[in-house]
Amino acid sequence: VEVLMGGSGGELAFIPNELQVNAGEQIVFKNNAGFPHNVIFDEDAVPAGVDVSSISMSEEDLLNAPGETYVVKLDKKGTYRFFCAPHQGIGMSGIVTVN
C-alpha cells in the first residue's frame, strides 16, 4: 500500500489519510512533492503494547526529496494514528486500521 506525502497541488496531507491494511502488510510512505515530511505514530493512539519508536521515523529525520520513502509493517491489529511532525499543526495526519 502506498501513501503519498503531499499532494501534487501542494497540499500538505497524507493521501490517502485513512487506509486499511492486513497485519504485516507493507506500507510505503512516499514523498510526493518535495516538502520535508516524516511519519510519526502517536503513542496515545496505537494498540496497547505497541512501541511507537519501533515503527516511527525519528522526529529529526525527514524525507526531503520527491520519491524518498519510508516503509513500515504493522503486525498488531487495531487502529494507529500517524502524523507528520513538521506539519502536524496544520492537520497533516492520518489513520491506518490493521485487520
Swiss-Prot record:
Protein's job: Participates in electron transfer between P700 and the cytochrome b6-f complex in photosystem I.
Name of the protein in its database record: Plastocyanin
Protein topology in the membrane: Peripheral membrane protein
Cofactor: Cu(2+)
The UniProt record lists the keyword Transport: yes
Upper taxonomic lineage: Eukaryota, Viridiplantae, Streptophyta, Embryophyta, Tracheophyta
Matches recorded under Pfam families: Copper-bind (PF00127)
Binding sites annotated in the UniProt record for Cu cation: H37, C84, H87, M92
Main subcellular location of this protein, as a coarse class: plastid
InterPro entries: BlueCu_1, BlueCu_1_BS, Copper_blue_Plastocyanin, Cupredoxin, Plastocyanin
A single GO cellular-component term on record: chloroplast thylakoid membrane
Keyword Cytoplasm: no
PROSITE patterns named among the record's database cross-references: COPPER_BLUE (PS00196)
TM region positions: none
Molecular function GO labels: copper ion binding; electron transporter, transferring electrons from cytochrome b6/f complex of photosystem II activity
Matches recorded under PANTHER family: PLASTOCYANIN MAJOR ISOFORM, CHLOROPLASTIC-RELATED
Location of the protein in the cell: Plastid, Chloroplast thylakoid membrane
Protein family (similarity comment): Belongs to the plastocyanin family.
